[in-house]
Amino acid sequence: GSEMCIRDSSISPAGIEALTARGCDVSADEVRPEALLLRSAELHGCEFNPELLAIGRAGAGYNNIPIPDCTEHGIVVFNSPGANAEAVKELELCSLVMASRDVLGSIGWVRGISGEGAAIPKLVEKGKSAFAGPELLGKALGVIGLGAVGALVANIALELGMTVYGYDPFMSVDAAWRLSREVLRADSVDDIFRNSDYISINVPYTEQTHHMLNAEAFAKMKRGVRIVNESRAEVVDDEAMTAALESGAVAKYVTDFPNEVILKAPNVIAMPHLGACTPESEDRCAVMAANQLYDYLLNGNIKNSVNLPDTSLSRMGVCRLCVIHRNVPRMITRILDFISDRNINVEHMINKPRDKYAYTIVDLGASIGEDIADSIRAMDNVLRVRVI
């Protein structure tokens, strides 16, 4: 069995069970593991042992993992996108209602009239209008980012009778299939800003999405827009959001990412990163990450990697050669020539590029020894070689 190290006490037991049931050696103190399974353990500044092949993150975000460093060391990093999508969708639904009607404020106010005895019913009738707010029915919701969560939010908003605009320049075929045809496609993010009474942002955090909602964006929106952010803190410029809330340009902001700046702003509902906090979601994330690690260790297949291309091949040969290398010309030719020069037949192969890197799986008609693997390791631009 493969040696796995769990770097987080918060990993769901279901994920660990998915590995131990298949004979993997799982412990929290493995010194030279072949794989790490983690949630929020911080890996920046860590020294990786040379045997480490893969890291599985139980969850979608991966800013606790030094991705470029891992890729250069030939370490595949997996995440589990979509495993917590249902949990986030349900919280976003709750957030849309809270952004509209002051449910939260009303609950606090009712607590405050405890002790008023028989007068409570009258006080309630008199005070309730202060917490009224518009219905979602018939309003326009703009969904920025139509991945696993965004598509679910768009679909459920349609069920509530909202008009839904969706914007996602990088939409996958899978997401397109999941999305209702009634979602209106926005050609630009500005279309979303102009048309929406409510905005839900569901994008990963990248250089391109940094402060996507900034002063310039708020200036293009309908006055009194209500915004929900359960994606990442950094996609919203908090200083600009504070100014927009103070001026009434934004009527309400619901965020899962509290910080000192935003907690001082008016009309904010801030939650303690509750998006994926359900037992079902934590189980799904851990099991998904564990299954992907196992398939990579056993078969060399890559699914849901954040740094290398998704690559899968059904096994056809006696032995499998897996090579992570830089995406440079003639790399595959050099590997295949080297193999055929030793009279070994190639039964099947696949090569996939991703930015500056690529991954090649070759199924061979005969077993190869470590000497051949070492010769391929010694080639320029090769980062990792495995024989399975």
Which residue ranges define each predicted feature?
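N-terminal Rossmann-fold NAD(P) dinucleotide-binding loop
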Residues: 150-151
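Glycine-rich Rossmann-fold phosphate-binding loop(s) that bind the pyrophosphate
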Residues: 146-147
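An N-terminal-biased, well-structured beta-alpha scaffold segment characteristic
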Residues: 2-3, 7-80, 194, 214-216, ...
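Oxidoreductase and adenylate-handling cofactor-binding alpha/beta cores
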Residues: 89-108, 155-162, 287-301, 336-340
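Rossmann-like adenosine-cofactor binding region
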Residues: 41-46, 169-261, 277
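Phosphate-binding beta-alpha-beta segment of Rossmann-like dinucleotide-binding domains, i.e.
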Residues: 81-140, 301-306
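NAD(P)-dependent dehydrogenase/reductase Rossmann-like domain
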Residues: 253, 263-266, 274-388
